[in-house]
Amino acid sequence: MKLHEYQAKQLFHRYGIPIPEGRLARSVEETGQAARAFAGRCVVKAQIHAGGRGKAGGVARVNSVDQARNIAQRLLQHTLVTAQTGDQGLYVGSLLVEEIVPVAREMYLSLTLDRANGRYCLIASPDGGVDIEQTARKTPERVRRLTIDPLVGLRAFHARDIARFLGLDGPLSAAASKVILSLYRCLLEKDASLVEINPLAVTEEGRLMAMDAKVSIDDSALFRQKEMLEWLDESQLAPLEVRAAHSDIAYIKMDGCIGCLVNGAGLAMATLDMLSECGGQPANFLDVGGGADQDKVVEAFRILLEDPAVEGVLVNIFGGIMRCDLIAQGLIAAAEQVGCQLPIVVRMAGARRDEGKHLLQQTQLNISWQDGLAAAATAIVRQLSPSA
């Protein structure tokens, strides 16, 4: 779960990380009032869950209240398209209005989950305000990565070493060490998968300040992060993803045309891999879970079919806790309810498989059965692309 910049900065402020003075505005009038508090000279930032706002016109430096209001009229209640949003863009429901802070130099600092090592990793660079991956490619010596031993944690001597790498000394080194340790505490206590400051700036007054902030919370930890869950902005999610979340269905929209309905995250990922191996493009990741009942399968199938990009469906079910005949009944009910004419290829294994197969073969719907995953993936790809 991603946080908005203003939410991330609010969180950082609690942990003693310096941030610019700012105000949240949800209307043109509130934007004008916020700008007036800074005598009209401020930065107006669109709040969306994507980067690239500056180049897309979502961040503007203004010198008057009228300019701030004009920016608000252009951005609020509209969608902002950036390099990271796709063509559909993201809805702008609020603006962060901040003081203008003169900056002497910019750095980069983040803590993220290194999934390859199964550990947290600190990433730092004396070059901030830019894409860290681009910096790592062009000048790898300008990027320091520190893998954190979970039994040791991030210690003060680690923080001091990173501060030296950033080129800081004296009071700024001490301030940077404090920021690094506070950021690590925030990461752990909020079950975050990413906390990022880009840029971490040294102001012309010689102070350290987080000019931009990014935080992502582990979705699996939201049950114990009640406040973070309350900060969820559903306007930043695809409508079908919101609907799926309310039904406890794991659904992620993708760019392909083959809808996938699977039980179990591992099996779902294997299904996507097999589809790609066979030349197909999945339209979604959809995991109904191991204990789904017929009603949940019906809702999952309806969500899948409401994506206009879906041209065919691949169903891959392992009947352990779930019975294949109940899944078959759910598929048939859902397809009949929505009047589905799309080709559907089903592969099932496990409890009451033969009964499920019999039910599907008796229906008049465009459903075909395959015994293996590779055969099922190949079948749906060939139905949609006969030349494949």
Curated annotation (Swiss-Prot):
EC number(s) given by UniProt: 6.2.1.5
Binding site for Mg(2+): 198, 212
Cofactor binding, per record: Binds 1 Mg(2+) ion per subunit.
Record's keyword terms, sorted: ATP-binding, Ligase, Magnesium, Metal-binding, Nucleotide-binding, Tricarboxylic acid cycle
Cofactor(s) the protein needs: Mg(2+)
Boundaries of every ATP-grasp domain copy: 9-243
Record's protein name: Succinate--CoA ligase [ADP-forming] subunit beta
